[in-house]
From Swiss-Prot:
Species whose genome carries this gene: Coprinopsis cinerea (strain Okayama-7 / 130 / ATCC MYA-4618 / FGSC 9003)
GO molecular function, one term: ribonucleoprotein complex binding
Stretches the record annotates as Disordered: 1-140, 289-336
Protein name, UniProt field: Ribosome biogenesis protein ERB1
GO biological process, one term: maturation of LSU-rRNA from tricistronic rRNA transcript (SSU-rRNA, 5.8S rRNA, LSU-rRNA)
Lineage, broadest ranks: Eukaryota, Fungi, Dikarya, Basidiomycota, Agaricomycotina
Family as reported in the entry's similarity comment: Belongs to the WD repeat BOP1/ERB1 family.
PANTHER family given in the database record: RIBOSOME BIOGENESIS PROTEIN BOP1, RIBOSOME BIOGENESIS PROTEIN BOP1 BLOCK OF PROLIFERATION 1 PROTEIN
Subcellular location: Nucleus, Nucleolus; Nucleus, Nucleoplasm
Biased composition regions of type Basic and acidic residues, renumbered to the chain: 323-336
Gene: ERB1
Alphabetized PROSITE patterns for the sequence: WD_REPEATS_1, WD_REPEATS_2, WD_REPEATS_REGION
GO cellular component: nucleoplasm; PeBoW complex; preribosome, large subunit precursor
Keyword match Transmembrane: no
Entry function: Component of the NOP7 complex, which is required for maturation of the 25S and 5.8S ribosomal RNAs and formation of the 60S ribosome.
Length: 751
């Protein structure tokens, strides 16, 4: 094949050179034809360095037809195997480019196979630097910080972490080991490895700012790729036609030239200006200019405003003030006056007296220039009424209570608590003398009076419509009373609920609260039908809170924190303390009107618990030093909290744990808060002897904020011993309000 290829190349070259040989007959006549053996030894067509031409090898005559070429190719192919075999044998014996293979018998197939020796790569090999014992790949090595090994080798075995010395070993290594200064830390092997001479040479070159390649020659001769002899560019790089701007005068150059022409005409540019000798020494004054300062120069002083017609000695009549304007100007503060003087009128200039404020005005002017900043502050004349939010008129938000219709009196003590029946016809109130009075709301007539030993802490009417009774809290006891003159059906249901003939089974866990009910045969209206004896040292019950359905009642006592809160169930006749440990002293508790949630107000926080799941939902942060009262909106989404520091906080439970709005309308401590069950109203009472009535409209749209409008301030109670109105309650069906005060009176406020 090699001989055949050489013959074909020679034949094709001969065909290309025939036209050239005819034109340069004189040149080819000097060439000598060589034999086949000589042609194989020399390079065809090369020119020697001394200017003589090399001799061409012998070229066979080309065939006349394609058939002869095909026959010659077939003959060459027949002779080719022998030639290639001989060449292969000669090359194997003479040149050992590749390692020799050994012929062995395979243990698996039993046939002969060639086995080559293992390749030992040098430094130039691609695999010499990649053959690392640790084959974990390009992963962060801090994954192996807590492991005894640092990776795996090619066989899947662990590569153990090399031992590391302390700081003393590192210091000794820098002194004793000469290779420590030429070593680098290998992250993959977690050890120091010495750098090779090639790597050190690269570091030195980079440090010196040289090319890191050692074979780079910055002074190699230039290779003329495009400008050498015979390599010149003849055709243009771009054959685009010439643009029109080549023959049109430039508009911008014309403007620049005209600018120079105008400067020459005006004399700002002198074409033939005489040259002055720069060697001539010029004298100048060293004190002509002040030394430069790094600080910016001071701002110039503001100029005095020019006088107006009002400052004339004979101003027009419209500039002269009247007596009312003079009095108003004198009453104003000097900084609020529009002018510092009052215009005056004189018949002539000689009648004008000396300006009495001249020295003061000059002194203020000097102070302004010396001390005042260079700024003019204009006082904003804003109407304070424009800053007040626009609220609807209270007359459009009626009905709400605005006058006192009747007054019920407890002659021997403070009226601490009051409550209204679910139908709104009856009211019950208690004082510190232990007297509980039942009276009619419309006329104030007292129907029944009960006397207990000890002061009344709290009382509350049961919210059930099919039963009629109320609870009274005295020292460590809760009594349940039935009012007289009830319907027989309602009375029978109430007696069955409070004193059933068959008691429910006792609970598995005994309670510290003892339930004791009177027998129906010996019971009378003058005595309680049911009593709950709280644990000892519980103290006075300060609050009684009913669940909406009337089956549960929660009490808060003034005793210890562990026995302070109790929840009682009537159907099971069982009492339990919902909290084993309470953070802070409990002030008030409330049931959620819709959900099984429980509000607990301590001194500074209001916590919302889920009684069904027994977990804390959220903690409200009113920012009050000491919480005194609390109430929940009938929708259950809003809570109002009052404190002894005169703050009233409105919370939106869906919005945030911080108050939505804080109201400060009372001058003294807030004692009681209450939402109206049906009307958009709520009231707050305080020790200042006043009752604040607010309109509180809550929208179903969550994107609309509640509307809170103050409506009326009710005053009708006397402040006694620093205490004012202790509790307020709304009637369920009318916009009427009942208030119990420290002066021993209970008032009914009607619309």
């Amino acid at each position: 094949m090699a001989l055949t290829d050489s013959k074909k190349k020679a034949t094709s070259k001969r065909k290309r050179d025939e036209p050239e040989q005819e034109q340069t007959h004189t040149l080819t006549s000097q060439l000598e034809m060589l034999t086949d053996e000589e042609g194989d030894d020399d390079n065809a067509g090369d020119v020697s360095d001394d200017g003589e031409y090399d001799e061409f090898p012998e070229i066979d005559a080309e065939s006349d037809s394609e058939e002869e070429d095909e026959e010659e190719d077939e003959e060459d192919e027949e002779d080719e195997p022998d030639i290639s075999d001989e060449e292969d044998s000669d090359s194997d014996e003479s040149l050992h480019v590749f390692p020799k293979a050994k012929t062995v018998v395979s243990d698996i197939t039993g046939q002969q196979k060639r086995v080559y020796p293992e390749i030992e790569p040098d430094y130039d090999s691609d695999s010499s630097t990649e053959d690392s014992p640790n084959r974990v790949g390009n992963v962060p090595m801090h994954w192996y910080d807590d492991l005894p090994h640092i990776g795996y080798d090619i066989n899947g075995k662990r590569v153990l972490r090399p031992a590391k010395g302390d700081e003393l070993d590192k210091f000794l290594a820098t002194i004793e080991d000469p290779d420590s200064w030429t070593s680098a830390f290998d992250k993959k092997m977690q050890m120091d490895k010495p750098l090779t001479s090639e790597e050190l040479d690269i570091i030195q070159r980079l440090y010196a700012g040289e090319n890191p390649d050692a074979t780079y020659d910055p002074y190699e001769p230039m290779v003329e790729w495009f400008t050498g002899k015979g390599k010149e560019e003849i055709m243009p790089l771009s054959a685009a036609p010439e643009p029109k701007r080549r023959w049109v005068r430039s508009k911008w150059e014309k403007q620049k030239i005209m600018k120079i022409v105008r400067a020459i005409r005006q004399g700002r540019i002198v074409p033939n200006k005489p040259k002055t000798s720069s060697k001539q020494f010029e004298f100048y004054s060293i004190w002509s200019s002040e030394p430069s300062s790094s600080q910016p120069p001071p701002l110039p002083a503001p100029k005095r405003p020019l006088p107006t017609n009002a400052e004339s000695y004979n101003p027009p009549e419209e500039y002269l003030p009247t007596e009312e304007e003079k009095q108003e100007w004198l009453k104003q503060d000097p900084e609020d006056r529009e002018r510092d003087f009052l215009p005056q009128k004189f018949s002539s200039l000689r009648h004008v007296p000396a300006y009495d404020q001249f020295i003061k005005e000059r002194f203020n002017r000097q102070l302004d220039l010396y001390l005042a900043p260079r700024i003019q502050r204009v006082k904003l004349n804003i109407d304070p009424n424009s800053l007040i939010p626009k609220l609807p008129s209270p007359s459009s938000l009626k009905p709400f209570p605005n006058y006192r219709s009747l007054l019920f009196t407890h002659p021997k003590g403070r009226a601490r608590c009051v409550s209204v029946s679910p139908d709104g016809a009856w009211a019950v109130s208690g004082d510190e003398d232990g007297v509980v009075s039942l009276w009619e709301v419309n006329v104030g007539c007292e129907i029944r009076r009960w006397k207990f030993e000890g002061k009344i802490g709290s009382l509350e009417w049961c919210p059930r419509a099919d039963a009629c009774y109320f609870a009274v809290g005295i020292e460590e006891t809760i009594h349940f009373l039935i009012p007289p003159n009830l319907d027989p059906t309602v009375l029978a249901l109430t007696q069955t609920l409070l004193a059933p003939s068959t008691l429910p089974p006792a609970p598995a866990t005994p309670s510290a609260v003892k339930w004791s009910s009177s027998s129906l045969s010996s019971w009378s209206v003058e005595q309680p039908i049911l009593s709950l004896n709280l644990p000892p040292s519980s103290g006075l019950p300060t609050q009684i809170s009913w669940h909406k359905k009337g089956d549960y009642i929660a009490t808060v006592s003034s005793g210890g924190a562990q026995n302070g809160v109790w929840i009682h169930q009537f159907t099971r006749r069982h009492s339990q303390a919902p909290f084993k440990k309470i953070k802070g002293a409990v002030q008030q508790v409330l049931f959620h009107p819709i959900k099984p949630h429980f509000f607990v107000a301590t001194q500074q926080y209001v916590r919302l618990y889920n009684l069904a799941e027994q977990k804390l939902i959220k903690t409200l942060q009113p920012g009050i030093r000491w919480i005194s009262s609390m109430d929940v909106h009938p929708s259950g989404d809003h809570v109002i909290v009052g404190g002894y520091d005169r703050k009233l906080c409105w919370f939106d439970l869906e919005l945030s744990e911080k108050p939505y709005k804080v109201l400060r309308y009372h001058s003294r401590a807030i004692r009681s808060l209450h939402f109206h069950p049906t009307y958009p109203l709520f009231a707050s009472s305080s020790d200042d002897g006043s009752i604040q009535i607010f309109h509180a409209r809550v929208y179903n749209d969550l994107m609309t904020d509640p509307l809170i409008v103050p409506l009326k301030i009710l005053r009708g109670h006397q402040i006694t011993d620093g205490l004012g109105i202790l509790q307020v309650k709304w009637t369920p069906k009318h916009p009427w309000l009942l208030s119990a005060a420290a002066d021993g009176t209970v008032a009914v406020w009607c619309s």
